[in-house]
Every structure is written in structure tokens, then in C-alpha cells.
Regions:
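Alpha-helical transmembrane segments and their immediate juxtamembrane cytosolic regions
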Residues: 1-348
């Protein structure tokens, strides 16, 4: 989740000026193109790991315990954490950045907290499925999920563009609850399968891993120039959009699995640094997005080079994000709002 800070800081300097705050002085295709590959797999990797961890919890705890944990760790941060940090951004923006309160809609409230909506929806699906079902799932359900995540995803985009024409808050809710869910559930599903088939991870040959890596890189090489608008690899018709979606699923899914495979075999669970990074992740993820926007505006000086501006923005975003975490974890009401576990008392 932490690599998102690098991506959002780079998005401020994007030549496409599509981010919430786009610098009028600093535009760098070279920098944006350097960071862009991580954008193609980071959320897919996140949901793959989330599916694995969800099934691990369900295998050890009852469904009631699992659901209560999801309400505390996912729904509460969505309702309170997102509301809090994005409200502060709105206040800051209304004073300094010409934000209008009339535009403080559902998207402004949730913004980058959309992944929490996906997690709570996926947790709801887990609650509906029998416990341990992923240990018994065959090929057909896997194909069905893959088809929904590819053909279904493209169909939803096509129907909305051609028939539904959803706009405003309705479009935002549609994207957050349905479109993103269909987009990322195949990876959550794959992570859930991995939990019950961990024995197969030990039998994967080095040759298979190399082939998967090569396949993922080839797919990435097709997506990369198209996403950066360097060369139109795929057409804008429905067949081109579907092909692009399939290639992206191959690229992001392969890289997500390879990352999972690597860290699965690196046993560092006892490291204090790793525990700290895990415990702070939700706070860093929720606060860095508005911080990038505010700091991007505050630091935007034409006297700085693109590299200086980016590095300053990146470093200060990390510093203030972790300062926020240190403050949040020390205040009970803020710990609750961000879904953190209670602090353990220190014994002398």
C-alpha cells in the first residue's frame, strides 16, 4: 500500500493533468512514465493478499468474529477516517484552492477510500459463501469469476456509456460499489484460493516462475505505451477494450502473484519494522492522498526543478503521514476512527 505515495506524488506532475491537483508549473512525462508501472499492479496485489488473509481469518475464527472485525477495521474507517481526512482537505481547499462546498459530494467524501468499499462488499460475499468453500472450488467457478472480471467489467462500462449515462453521485456509487468490485474481485478470489492451496506453492518450479514473469512483462509491455498514450495498441471499440482488459489482467495478476510468492517465502513476521509498517498502513493510505494534494499546492514553486519538486513532495508526504499515524495511535477516538487495534500496555 505504501507505494501508492510514489504514484500519487508523480500524478501531481502528470502531463495529462488528470489528478485532483495538477501542478501548473511542473509536468514530467519521464517521471510519470517511470512510476507508472506500479499503478498497473499495486491494487491487484493488495486485493490478492486481502483475499488470502480473509480466508485465513475465516479458517481460524467464526463468521461472526470475522464480520465484527470487518466492521471495525473496514466500515468504521470508511465512515469516519475517510470523512475526517477528506473533510479537512475540503476545508483547506475551500480556503486556499477555490474548492466549493457545493461540490463536496460522495466522491469528495470517499475519494481514495474506495478500496474500503470493495473490502466490505467482498467481506459480504465471504459471509454468504460456506466456510471453506475455496478448498472445494473447481475450474468452472474460477472461469466464471474470470469472465465476470473481464467480459462483465467491459460490458458494464459499455452499457453505462451507451445506455445508462449515469452521472453525479449515482455514477460515483456505481463505480465504487459495482464497477470496482467487478474489476478487483477476481484478484481477491485468487487470493482466497491461494490460502487453501498453499501446498501447491512449494511445488511451483523455477521454470514456471520465469515463464510467468516473462508472460507478465510481455503483457505489461503492451499496456505500458497504450496507457501513457505513446502508441495506440488497442482500439476504442468494445473488442479493443476487452482485449486491453484481458492483457491487463494477465500483466497485473502475474506480477501480483510473483510478489505474493516472494513475500510468502520470506519469513520476517517477527520484525518490529514489518509490524510497524503493517499497523500503520491503513492510516498512511488514507491520509497520504489528501496530503499529496495539499502539499502539492503548498510546495508548487516554478523555481524548483521537476525532480526537486517531486522529491520534496514525496519526502514531506511520508513524514507528515507517519506523524499523523503517531498521533492517531495515541488517541483512543482516533484509533477507533481509523480501525486501529487498542494499544497494548507496556509492562515494566
Amino acid at each position: 500500500m505504501l507505494i501508492g505515495v510514489f504514484w500519487h506524488a508523480a500524478a501531481v506532475l502528470s502531463p495529462f493533468a488528470a489528478f485532483v491537483y495538477a501542478s501548473p508549473y511542473h509536468r514530467s512525462m519521464a517521471l510519470y512514465a517511470t512510476i507508472y508501472p506500479e499503478h498497473l499492479f499495486r491494487m491487484e496485489a493488495f486485493f490478492l493478499v486481502s483475499g488470502f488473509l480473509s480466508q485465513m481469518t475465516l479458517a481460524r475464527k467464526t463468521k461472526a468474529v470475522f464480520w465484527r472485525a470487518r466492521l471495525k477495521r473496514v466500515l468504521v474507517p470508511l465512515l469516519l477516517g475517510c470523512l475526517g481526512v477528506n473533510f479537512l482537505l475540503q476545508v483547506f481547499g475551500s480556503i486556499f484552492m477555490e474548492y466549493r462546498w457545493a461540490h463536496y459530494d460522495v466522491w469528495r467524501w470517499v475519494m481514495h477510500g474506495w478500496f474500503l468499499i470493495c473490502l466490505i462488499v467482498f467481506a459480504g460475499i465471504d459471509m454468504l459463501l460456506p466456510r471453506g468453500v475455496f478448498a472445494r472450488i473447481g475450474v468452472l467457478p474460477c472461469l466464471l469469476v474470470a469472465i465476470i472480471g473481464s467480459v462483465g467489467y467491459v460490458a458494464l462500462i459499455f452499457w453505462n456509456n451507451e445506455s445508462w449515462h449515469l452521472g453525479g453521485d449515482l455514477s460515483t456509487l456505481y463505480n465504487f460499489f459495482i464497477l470496482h468490485g467487478v474489476q478487483y474481485y477476481p484478484f481477491y478470489f485468487a487470493g482466497s484460493l491461494l490460502y487453501y492451496h498453499q501446498d501447491k506453492l512449494a511445488r511451483i518450479s523455477r521454470r514456471s516462475l520465469i515463464l510467468l514473469g516473462a508472460q507478465s512483462l510481455i503483457a505489461m509491455a503492451l499496456i505500458y505505451p497504450h496507457g501513457l498514450e505513446l502508441y495506440p495498441i488497442f482500439n476504442n471499440n468494445i473488442d479493443g477494450i476487452l482485449t486491453q482488459r484481458l492483457v491487463l489482467m494477465v500483466a497485473s495478476g502475474g506480477i501480483a502473484f510473483l510478489l505474493f510468492y516472494y513475500f510468502y517465502h520470506v519469513q520476517r513476521e517477527g520484525s518490529r519494522t514489518v509490524r510497524y509498517l503493517i499497523n500503520s498502513a491503513i492510516v498512511i493510505y488514507l491520509v497520504h492522498h489528501p496530503l499529496v494534494i495539499m502539499l502539492g499546492w503548498l510546495l508548487d514553486d516554478p523555481a524548483l526543478s521537476n525532480t526537486q519538486y517531486y522529491l520534496l513532495l514525496l519526502i514531506l508526504t511520508f513524514i507528515f503521514s507517519y506523524l499523523c499515524y503517531e498521533g492517531v495511535r495515541r488517541v483512543a477516538i482516533l484509533r477507533f476512527a481509523f480501525g486501529l487495534k487498542p494499544q497494548q500496555p507496556r509492562h515494566a
